[in-house]
Curated annotation (Swiss-Prot):
ATP binds at residues 9-10, 17, 88-90, 98, 123-129. GO terms for cellular component: cytoplasm. Belongs to the bacterial CoaD family. This is Phosphopantetheine adenylyltransferase. Homohexamer. It is found in: Cytoplasm. Its main location: cytoplasm. It catalyses: (R)-4'-phosphopantetheine + ATP + H(+) = 3'-dephospho-CoA + diphosphate. It comes from Desulfitobacterium hafniense (strain Y51). CDD domains: PPAT (cd02163).
Length: 163
């Protein structure tokens, strides 16, 4: 069985993340979305909330599982029996960072490959940070995230607004 993990903080999950996830399922029997606990980042959503948002977003993808993790990505990959790490790339800036990360992961776990998938052009500018920024200013984010994620973000930033 070919198993990959797709790690990230997913705060929040975006349509760009989902595009990479759907495309990854074409290459692997199982893709585990590895939702990271990152003590270096302040997240809008708790780990449990991020997992729930992803489970709802990926409910039609039968070979996808969602799990939280803390620690080294390659160690989590080993625990899951995965032999690949999926990473999405939007631009050159992503590549430089991701390339360094992939080299470090290869040194730590030579048996685990990092596979880069380029985002579709319509998602190349989307980031969780920019979506949160726009939502905090009551901007329209409906084309960047699934509807349930949009509602959850607005509830966080603007609890006074009804659905």
């Amino acid at each position: 069985m070919r198993i990959a993990i797709y790690p990230g903080t997913f705060d929040p999950v975006t349509n760009g993340h989902l595009d990479i996830l759907k495309r990854a399922t074409e290459f692997f029997d199982e893709v585990i979305v590895a939702v990271a606990v990152d003590s270096n980042k302040t997240t809008l959503f708790s780990l449990e909330e991020r997992i729930q948002l992803l489970e709802t977003a990926a409910e039609e993808l039968s070979q996808v599982k969602i799990r939280g993790f803390e620690g080294l990505t390659v160690e989590f990959a080993r625990q899951c029996g995965a032999n690949a790490i999926i990473r999405g790339l939007r631009a050159m800036q992503d590549f430089e960072y991701e390339f360094q990360l992939a080299l470090m992961n290869k040194k730590l776990a030579a048996d685990i490959e990092t596979i880069f998938l380029m985002t579709q052009s319509e998602f190349s500018f989307i980031s969780s940070s920019s979506i949160k920024w726009a939502a905090s200013l009551k901007g329209n984010i409906s084309e960047f995230v699934p509807p349930h994620v949009e509602r959850a973000i607005y509830k966080k930033y603007h609890p006074e607004i009804d659905d």
